[in-house]
């Protein structure tokens, strides 16, 4: 088993270094080694999870193509420019809401330069709002009803009669309070901008310009607004179907019994329908949807789940008895330790959904309560730990003052403190909630 684990970890590390779809395809190579060299039987690939994510990507990409994302950024810019002194508290709420609505953290790219510029103009150290804004976009993944991670968790806990509302009632308040805690801790990070040596050096060397960043205009305001309304309506529909099971239709089977429509199918149908309506109502070119940043970045996550999660699932399935025998008694006594395992795995996989898909079968097999697993859900937000995730790199590049940085020892970077605070508070509150309620 240890040799198999070594191959799995090597595949993950090399895949992460390759970037893009590298993580997913290396997972496929690792799966080939597990199957043909070690003789493990492949488990079923996560088809339902992947199809749900593809449907959400289709809708979000169409909204972006219709100008909906640009319109949301305009709204965010107006809010931040009207309240510049509160930017450290408002910017994480903006990126949290963006991600909560769209289901992907990649929408944060569009608002990060606005945050950086408003902070600079107000003479607030940009590191403070940027650091927690990036973390908020990650935390919201585990609160969004249509994110790949939430969809994967819901799919895998369906056998326990867990509804979407059961997940959201814990994950939304916990992650939101965690983000606010991180924001308050960020209020006094580092020196004031006027005293920062890197900022002063850039001014002295003429590297800092006073050019203002402005978001691009919305070409067709009506089409953009319609796309946002259609997308949000579909999201609300998913929440309603997920929380009120009586709304889901029943179908008669040939043997006389009946079966209720699966939540996976509802998500797929509503999101594909939303995508179609956006294209039809706004007369947006479908080709434009696949050329946007949301489609490209999110499809990489699908490939990652396909390869990495399938490889991880096969490894865990093939070694389940040995794994249970070695760690079951520890996890039974201290189930929160499974949260630490989720955190570490998310650092390696750079994906909340892939982490859930790879690790949750082990948690279920170890007998961990489904509500405990929901409470530990925010622990999969650990990929800020190593500062090479695209949104982290983007935030550093957008900060012209140089205050948002990676430290000399790599791990002492601008996102470590807000990330640990937000994740720690979210998980702690989740554990408290399941004990009280």
Language-model-detected regions and their locations in the chain:
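Helix-loop-helix module between adjacent transmembrane segments
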Residues: 57-61, 91-107, 132-144, 171-181, ...
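Alpha-helical transmembrane segments
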Residues: 48-57, 167-182, 257-271, 372-386
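Membrane-helix interface motif
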Residues: 145-156, 243-252, 311, 315-320
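Terminal transmembrane helical module of multi-pass membrane proteins
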Residues: 352-354, 387, 392-397
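Membrane-embedded alpha-helical segments and adjacent helix-loop junctions characteristic
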Residues: 10, 14-16, 26-35, 40-124, ...
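Hydrophobic transmembrane alpha-helices of multi-pass small-molecule transporters
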Residues: 1-60, 197-313, 417-437
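Membrane-core helix-loop-helix motifs of multi-pass transport proteins
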Residues: 117-227, 369-379, 394-437
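Membrane-interfacial helical/loop segments at transmembrane boundaries in membrane proteins
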Residues: 155-156, 249-258, 324-330
């Amino acid at each position: 088993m240890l040799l198999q684990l070594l191959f799995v970890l090597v595949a993950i590390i090399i895949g992460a270094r390759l970037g893009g779809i590298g993580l997913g395809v290396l997972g496929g190579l690792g799966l080939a080694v597990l199957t043909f060299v070690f003789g493990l039987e492949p488990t079923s690939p996560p088809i339902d999870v992947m199809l749900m994510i593809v449907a959400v990507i289709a809708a979000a990409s169409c909204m972006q193509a219709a100008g909906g994302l640009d319109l949301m950024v305009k709204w965010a810019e107006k809010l931040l420019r009207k309240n510049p002194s509160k930017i450290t508290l408002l910017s994480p709420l903006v990126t949290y809401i963006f991600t909560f609505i769209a289901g992907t953290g990649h929408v944060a790219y569009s608002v990060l330069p606005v945050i950086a510029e408003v902070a600079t103009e107000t003479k607030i150290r940009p590191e403070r709002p940027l650091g927690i804004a990036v973390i908020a976009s990650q935390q919201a993944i585990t609160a969004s009803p249509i994110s790949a991670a939430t969809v994967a968790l819901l799919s895998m806990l369906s056998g326990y009669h867990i509804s979407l509302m059961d997940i959201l009632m814990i994950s939304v308040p916990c992650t939101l309070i965690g983000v606010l805690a991180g924001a308050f801790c960020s209020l006094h990070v580092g020196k004031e901008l006027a005293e920062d040596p890197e900022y002063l050096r850039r001014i002295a060397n003429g590297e800092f310009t006073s050019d203002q960043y402005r978001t691009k205009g919305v070409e067709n305001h009506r089409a953009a607004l319609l796309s946002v309304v259609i997308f949000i309506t579909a999201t609300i529909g998913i929440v309603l179907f997920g929380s009120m099971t009586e709304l889901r239709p029943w179908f008669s089977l040939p043997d006389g019994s009946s079966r209720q429509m699966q939540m996976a199918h509802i998500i797929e149908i509503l999101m594909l329908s939303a995508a179609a309506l956006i294209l039809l109502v706004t007369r947006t070119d479908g080709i434009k949807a696949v050329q946007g940043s949301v489609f490209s970045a999110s499809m990489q996550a699908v490939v990652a789940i396909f390869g990495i999660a399938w490889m991880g699932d096969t490894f865990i399935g093939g070694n389940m008895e040995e794994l249970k025998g070695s760690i079951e008694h520890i996890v039974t006594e201290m189930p929160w330790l499974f949260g630490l395992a989720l955190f570490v795995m998310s650092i390696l996989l750079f994906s909340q959904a892939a982490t859930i898909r790879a690790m949750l079968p082990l948690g279920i097999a170890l007998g961990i309560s489904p509500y405990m697993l929901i409470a530990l859900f925010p622990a999969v937000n650990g990929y800020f730990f190593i500062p090479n995730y695209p949104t982290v790199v983007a935030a550093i590049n957008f900060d012209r003052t140089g205050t948002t940085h990676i430290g000399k020892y790599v791990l002492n970077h601008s996102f470590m403190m807000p990330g640990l605070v937000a994740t720690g508070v979210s998980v702690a509150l989740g554990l408290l909630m399941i004990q009280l309620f």
